[in-house]
Amino acid sequence: MLVWFSTLALMGIRGILWQPSVLFAINPMHAIRFFMANGMQGFLVLGAVFLVTTGGEALYADLGHFGEKPIQVDWFSIVGISLVLHYFGQGALLIRQPSAAHNPFYLLAPKWALYPLVALSTMATVIASQAIISGVFSLTRQAIQLGYLPRMEIVHTSRAEIGQVYIPTVNWALMFATIALVIGFRSSTNLAGAYGLAVSMTMIITTVLAYVVARDLLGWSALTAGAVTVAFLIGDLAFLGANLAKIADGGWFPLLVAAVVFTLMTTWRQGRRILNLRLREGALTPEDFVKSLRGHPPVRVPGTAVFMHRSGGVIPPALLHSLKHYKALHKQVVLLTVLTEEVSHLGDDERLQVDDFGEGIYRVTCRYGYMEEADIPALLERVSRERHLAIPPMDTTYFLGRESLIITSRPSGMAMWREKLFASMMRNAESAARFFRLPPNRVVELGAQIEF
């Protein structure tokens, strides 16, 4: 990428040397006069001007891979300077040779450099695309941890960086979407409308979220945060307005993708909430369960049973089903709940909570940040070590509940098609045993049918 941006800078300098007067374009009065002279047509030109943001694509990286400082240093020392020089060079070329407007990038280079430049551009495209793909992986993982998407297989590609992940399902989806885009739009020019609308809306969302960060995390006053946000929104909304004219020319595509993703995420979130309410209907609390054990003690068998449940306030249905069918209970029962908090990381002192209800019944609540990975066997080893609750790995069985939804006419607050969509997402979700890295030979899954 250093070679790429250096090449852009050299190409720009070459053009500037042809027509040094292009540097006068840095004066904003030229832009103001242009808008005043051209009115609405001048405003719509912003939609084309906005495409200069494509130059920064190769710098893109989610903060799970690179920190704030490296990105700032790269931008101000290399990327920003190279892009400004290059766009000045293209402007100089168009002043000197207006007929070059159909392909100013390659015409800015010497003829002998055409094929090397095509090869370099291809490599830069691959690298820039890889950065975006990695960002999608990280965002998907965070959405899964926060409960907005079903569990998927997550492969860690680095032992040192927890943010470097690979998600096969997302990778295949991106591949098919990319092929469909190429076949459907046929050229990058036809994609300009889709790109402009997608990025301008993303910038507005980022600006609004920056206000929340400034208020809640940085402690800025409402006046200061609001003034900065409004200043950015003026420019963002201007670009969005110019790009709205391109909805019919490809701008519909990012809106369609956003609608599909939004529907999937909200359906999963709302469906899980309704399912949790169904599971809690008539459920026993740990205290009531222990009372029933004392009144009617079952046969106790050696070993430890770990029952995972998303709601720590009630007894998991899998435990009740196990007791009903086997007529026995392990001497030690651990009710394990894994919670993902809306922060990236949690301190060790906030991680674990262990409650002893008596009769060998314990509740372990484990909290993780959305950038952290839950490793249940490692967690239970830590519980044994720090909380003096012996959970020998070779003497522990994990019981998981697997719900099968029966779609009925019972009102749930969701449309029938969304109920069916949620049921399909449930069926195709990654197994909890694999997701939480449970040893396969020590897992028992108990199914339950639930009217939804």
Explain the meaning of each model-derived region:
Residues 1-452:
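The structured alpha-helical core of multi-pass membrane proteins
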